[in-house]
Amino acid sequence: MSLDERIITQAILETYFEKFKSSLDLDVAIVGGGPSGMTAARLLAADGFNVALFERKLSLGGGMWGGGMTFNMIVVQEESVHLLTDVGVPVKRYKDNYFTADAVAATTTLASAACLAGAKIFNCMSVEDVMLREENGVKRVTGIVINSSPVEIAGLHVDPVVLGSKYLVEATGHAVEVLQTLVRKNDVRLNTPSGGIEGEQSMWADTAEINTVKNTREIFPGLYVAGMAANASYGSYRMGPIFGGMLLSGEKVAADIAAKLKG
């Protein structure tokens, strides 16, 4: 049977917009496709929730691809190993509490597992703002404002569109881009000591890994922080090419949001 290029185009258009239309009212929107975002997306989707992940770049993975300084191996600690092995990533013990995995295998498998669990992935999609509603004087995040990344990169004056979500996960890493926009544009106070973004400190892997999980929480009504964004929001340290805290943060934010959605 000969191929018709028009049908190829039609297939892409119809199936993509079916996926897009099913994301108009999400249970959870996740911004950022690093290890914490991918883990959260997989677990929430596997739990039956309507979940979509938005990644500005063409590929998912955040900083995981390059390991340390482009030496593409990563390290995780023992308590997080299950979040790799559960999806089929081979892990090797290096020393007590130090396990290694191939960075490319880990990244691609985490991304695939999220998709296969039912999470919808929108790459090349930038989240430029949030949607807010106010009830009884309390503001709450109720959705995301999105645009095509090429539009953003080219600096074109093109209006975005909006998707609703019951909860939003800020997992954009060091830059905390969603929170930066929320704070800059609105008279709001975050659930932090100062009421603002505390800022990331320098390298201290042990404390950073502990705090990545500890700081994973609802920082503003309807908005959670996870991964490195959690530490940047609450003023903790960076950790470098050890990824256990990121994975555990994704697991924690998924569990916390699932508990709220189940009511």
UniProtKB/Swiss-Prot annotation:
Residues the record lists as binding NAD(+): 36, 55-56, 63, 127, 157-159, 228
Positions bound to glycine: 238
This protein's record includes keyword Mitochondrion: no
Top EC class, one word: transferase
GO molecular function: iron ion binding; pentosyltransferase activity
Recorded superkingdom: Bacteria
Gene3D superfamilies, sorted: FAD/NAD(P)-binding domain
Assembly and interaction partners: Homooctamer; tetramer of dimers.
Name of the protein in its database record: Thiamine thiazole synthase
Catalytic activity: hydrogen sulfide + glycine + NAD(+) = ADP-5-ethyl-4-methylthiazole-2-carboxylate + nicotinamide + 3 H2O + H(+)
Pathway connected to this protein: Cofactor biosynthesis; thiamine diphosphate biosynthesis
GO terms classed as biological process: thiamine biosynthetic process; thiamine diphosphate biosynthetic process; thiazole biosynthetic process
UniProt cofactor(s): Fe(2+)
Function statement: Involved in the biosynthesis of the thiazole moiety of thiamine. Catalyzes the conversion of NAD and glycine to adenosine diphosphate 5-(2-hydroxyethyl)-4-methylthiazole-2-carboxylate (ADT), an adenylated thiazole intermediate, using free sulfide as a source of sulfur.
Residues involved in Fe cation binding: 159, 174
Alphabetic keyword roster: Iron, Metal-binding, NAD, Thiamine biosynthesis, Transferase
Recorded family membership: Belongs to the THI4 family.
Entry EC number(s): 2.4.2.59
